[in-house]
A protein has these predicted regions:
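Short alpha-helical
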Residues: 16-17, 45, 78-81
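Alpha-helix boundary/capping detector
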Residues: 36, 44, 51, 75-77, ...
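Short Fe-S-cluster ligation motifs
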Residues: 43-59
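Non-catalytic, surface beta->alpha helical segment in thiol-disulfide oxidoreductase systems
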Residues: 58, 63-93
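Residues at alpha-helix termini
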Residues: 32, 52-54, 90
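Local sequence-structure signature of Cys/Sec-based thiol-disulfide redox active-site neighborhoods
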Residues: 1-34
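Thiol-based oxidoreductase modules, predominantly thioredoxin-like and allied folds used
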Residues: 10-12, 33-48
């Protein structure tokens, strides 16, 4: 069975940090051979199971899913290097 890996970037309207994090996330994926998909969504439009499981109050928030199970979430911006470390630690690479 193939493992499905997704990273959701939860955003909100007018969030400059969200736009910065989106650029970093997409650049990290482009610069590496990662097979996860990236989904950028306003927090109100996230899948219901994410909105039920996580109380999102700060943005941007990255949500790491494996087979539709939340493995990890982190709020705020970070460097590309830090994001790569998280991806490696979670075996999302």
């Amino acid at each position: 069975m193939e493992i499905s890996k997704h990273i959701y970037l939860a955003t909100t309207e007018g969030c400059e940090a969200c736009r910065i994090m989106e650029r970093i996330l997409k650049q990290v994926q482009r610069d590496n051979v990662y097979t996860f998909s990236i989904q950028v969504r306003d927090y109100k439009l996230l899948p219901e199971f994410i909105r039920v499981d996580l109380v999102l109050t700060d943005f941007p928030t990255l949500i790491f899913l494996e087979n539709n199970v939340i493995k990890y979430n982190v709020t705020g911006t970070m460097s590309a290097k830090k994001l790569q470390e998280i991806i490696k630690d979670l075996h999302f690479n």
